[in-house]
Design a protein with these regions (language model features):
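Helix-loop-helix hairpin linking two adjacent transmembrane segments in secondary transporters
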Residues: 32-33, 37-91, 137
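A late C-terminal transmembrane helix in Major Facilitator Superfamily
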Residues: 235-282
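C-terminal transmembrane helical hairpin of 12-TM major facilitator-type secondary transporters
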Residues: 180-232
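Intracellular juxtamembrane helix-capping segments at the cytosolic ends
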Residues: 17-30, 224-238
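Cytoplasmic helix-loop-helix junction between adjacent transmembrane helices
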Residues: 7-44
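Flexible cytoplasmic inter-helical loops of multi-pass small-molecule transporters
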Residues: 84-109
């Protein structure tokens, strides 16, 4: 058990580090192609999640649980080798004047007391709490309603896969579209998410169609909220150092909020699996994410 906790903590730190700094890397090395390269790295991230959701069970059945751990160890090792190979070529891509920009960014008001930055934190936390709560507890909720285990697997895979086209299209749309276009995207996610949250009040069914629609609608809303806020880290900041500050602040606070979701939902689920308390929480989280998205669109720069 101790080694499992230590290993999980190390994995979490590695993921958190990359999540925070990838938006600033994109801003630093590809300032004129933020949309394209945000699409590239987020697509690969979500594709990896979907792929491993599919292959984990077959590999464990075929070769044992330890074989999956080997695969998981080799994957970051390959990423490290590629990164070490590319490192000597990266420093030439950042212009020297950015050293002065760093001093300016660090001397600005602290990001944690910047009211505009809190919109990013709340939006990131809202979509994260939705995502982690859904993935942790929806299989149990569907099983409670007598949905077959095979069907549950397909529905959860659909939840993951719906985000892939969003990762390809949304960042470039956010770069190209003006304020009205961005507001439309946020509004579409909000409306879709509220419809999905409203459906949970009528969840007493084992219908595959019902739960598939629920999964796709909520997957679209969460995926769009996530891609929106990650892309806006770069768009709404003037340099990579400020991007790193904003990304770190929003994700640190956001993931802290997200950690509360599965625990509190589990407590409510234990009291009443079909209770309205958890359904109202979904509505509140969607509403908060939508409102914060509108505020972010109207924010010029941080």
């Amino acid at each position: 058990m101790p080694t499992m906790i230590i290993g999980t903590s190390l994995i979490g730190m590695g993921i958190a580090y990359l999540n925070v700094y990838m938006p600033s890397f994109v801003t630093a090395y590809f300032p004129s192609n933020i949309g394209l390269y945000t699409s590239v790295y987020t697509f690969s991230m979500m594709f990896g999640v979907a792929l491993f959701n599919v292959i984990t069970a077959p590999i464990m059945v075929w070769a044992g649980w330890w074989s999956m751990l080997i695969v998981l160890a080799i994957t970051p090792l390959l990423a490290l080798i590629i990164w070490l190979f590319l490192m000597p070529h990266l420093s030439e891509e950042i212009h020297e004047p950015q050293v002065e920009v760093k001093k300016e960014a660090m001397s600005n008001d602290q990001i944690w007391v910047n009211k505009k930055a809190w919109a990013f934190l709340i939006m990131f936390g809202s979509q994260s709490i939705l995502n982690y709560t859904f993935t942790a507890w929806m299989p149990s909720l569907m099983a409670y309603h007598q949905v077959g285990s095979g069907v549950i697997g397909i529905i959860m895979a659909a939840f993951s896969l719906i985000g892939l086209p969003i990762t390809v299209l949304l960042p470039q749309l956010l770069v190209k579209w003006g304020r009205l276009g961005k507001l439309f995207l946020v509004g579409s996610a909000g409306v879709t998410g509220l419809i999905a949250s409203g459906m949970l009040f009528f969840q007493n069914t084992s219908s595959t169609i019902f739960w598939m629609i629920e999964s796709l609608l909520l997957g679209y809303a969460i995926g769009l909220f996530f891609m929106f806020v990650v892309t806006m880290f770069a768009i709404k900041t003037s340099n990579p150092y400020r991007t790193a500050q904003l990304s770190g602040m929003a994700q640190a606070g956001g993931y802290f909020i997200a950690a509360l979701g599965p625990v509190t939902y589990g407590w409510a689920f234990g009291l009443n699996p079909t209770g309205n308390l958890q359904n109202v929480a979904f509505v509140v989280a969607i509403t908060l994410a939508t409102i914060m998205g509108v505020i972010i669109v109207k924010t010029k720069k941080i």
